[in-house]
Design a protein with these regions (language model features):
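Predominantly extracellular beta-rich ligand-binding scaffolds that present long acidic/polar faces
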Residues: 1-194
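C-terminal outer-membrane/trafficking sorting elements
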Residues: 198-227
Length: 227
């Protein structure tokens, strides 16, 4: 939509490219390349305060063009920072399909955070790694994280896969604090889920003990009391 591609910077503190406060409203599709995104295709750098309202459809074309589709950045590598971006377009792809980010390549193992972003568009895939915010990361577990992001769009895949979630599409992506899943959305396999002790006062005949997540924070229950 805005930038076709850039590759630079092998440290998370190095951003030789910055895309800031840009808007795309045009529809996108790719039949040959790395896939479509409203703001940047194959990209290394920072993306801040950008908005996409265009629809992306990469369900036709070569196998390569069907791999990465997203509302903001389709395929990221090396130093990547996505902050304060919003997608409201419908995102339709095959594999590595995300409302904000399609895939983070292995790169040099730099830590990356997708933060303060919102997806309001539907996200549809046909294979593995489909998510409302970040679909996939090839880096070591936890090096890529999603924090303070909101997904309000329905996420679906026509393929049989457990790699699908309202926030992330792979367990290699860590979930930080402040993430929100919109009311009424279907729970998906990779969503943060409580252990079933949501209401410690409802079970009056037994003592509740355990640990669960609430709004991205760990809650400890001991003898029916939350800590």
């Amino acid at each position: 939509g805005i930038c076709g591609g850039s590759q630079s910077g092998k440290s998370i503190t190095t951003y030789n490219y910055l895309i800031e406060s840009c808007t795309n409203s045009g529809n996108l599709s790719t039949t040959n390349g790395v896939g479509s995104a409203g703001i940047a295709g194959s990209y290394s750098g920072a993306v801040k305060s950008c908005t996409n309202s265009g629809n992306a459809d990469d369900t036709k074309g070569t196998a390569k063009s069907k791999q990465y589709t997203a509302g903001i950045v389709s395929c990221a590598s090396f130093a990547v920072d996505i902050d304060g971006c919003t997608n409201s377009g419908s995102i339709n792809g095959v594999k590595n399909v995300g409302g904000i980010l399609g895939n983070v390549m292995k790169g040099d193992g730099a830590a990356t955070t997708i933060k303060n972003c919102t997806n309001n568009g539907t996200v549809s895939g046909q294979d593995l790694y489909v998510a409302g915010i970040a679909a996939n990361s090839a880096r070591a577990d936890g090096l890529v994280s999603v924090a303070s992001c909101t997904n309000n769009g329905e996420v679906t895949s026509t393929g049989t896969t457990e790699f699908i979630g309202n926030l992330r599409g792979n367990t290699t992506i860590a979930l930080g604090e402040g993430n929100v899943i919109g009311a009424g959305l279907k729970a998906l396999p990779l969503d943060p889920a409580p252990t079933g002790i949501n209401n410690v006062n409802a079970n009056t005949n037994r003592t509740a003990n355990g640990v669960f997540l609430r709004n991205g924070k760990i809650v400890i229950v001991k003898n029916n009391k939350e800590y």
